[in-house]
Amino acid sequence: MHNGSGRVRLLILIFLQGLLVVRSSSSVVIAADIASSSPPTGRDPVASLQRRLDQREVQLEYATPWGYLLSVLKQLQVPLSSQTLVFSRTSFQQFLISPATPRALYFNDTVYVGWVPGGDVLEISAVDPERGAMFYFLNQKKAATPQFIQREECLQCHESPRTLGIPGHLVRSVFPDSDGLPQLQAGSYQTDHTSPLKERWGGWYVTGTHGSQRHMGNVWVIDKDKPDQLNTEAGANVISLQSYFQVSTYPRPDSDLVALMVLEHQTRLHNLLAKAGIESRVAQEQQTAVKRALGEPVAQWSESTRRRIHGQDD
């Protein structure tokens, strides 16, 4: 009997390990599955603000030409000084975006807010402590009780290998034409804190001085037969954007390079933290399944689970 039970135990273990190997063959698929199937925690800042609106604890004020933008920023404690401006058509309301009408993006530690002049909606993403990024729209039509609506279509771009396979954030640098359309045949860059300056800010406005280094911002492709050639000298060390578009349309007249660099660092960090949290939960769920099947104490971690969560050196 002892040998028989041992063989059964071994077969169960082999079977379960096989399932885990199959499931672990793509960490992107696992993380995306866990993140997408988990219910919202309701603990992200936008969900919290919606509860306060529903309970009449706060109100959103509407102001032309920005709609609810300024009030949303105030309630979510997002500073206007975080404003960055992107004129490439690489977001949801792309047909309204151009070098003459860039999209404004504002952020703090846990929220990103996008506004386009004349846009139907505010585009908002917030950091959920378990699921990663949560995406919302807020209709810009004046309403008695504005509603933040969760939108899954944002995941078409915001859940991919570029975001580590989870709902996340990304900053892109492209070769835009004079209408803001990315010339994708020239390629593009995903920007984070490790990116060299020369590959940053294609399709973005950039204000501030940066010495002799050059970047891709403030300019667009002139010759579509040579889409990877930008006059980076013309876009360097720009102090004012008044010659590019009507800056009075926006709450601020700038798109500060320091704000851009913080944004690029933060989006990558948010994705890494979310990925680590999701994969830790995956490891614990798989550990629980194996332990229960073998009749062992669930609370006792195996060495392999400990290494997956804490790393090889722990």
Each language-model region and where it sits:
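N-terminal alpha-helical interaction blocks
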Residues: 30-119
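Sequence context surrounding c-type heme c attachment/ligation sites in exported
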Residues: 114-314
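Serine residues within intrinsically disordered or low-complexity segments
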Residues: 5, 24-27
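Bacterial N-terminal signal peptides
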Residues: 11-25
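N-terminal secretory signal peptides that target proteins for export/translocation
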Residues: 1-8
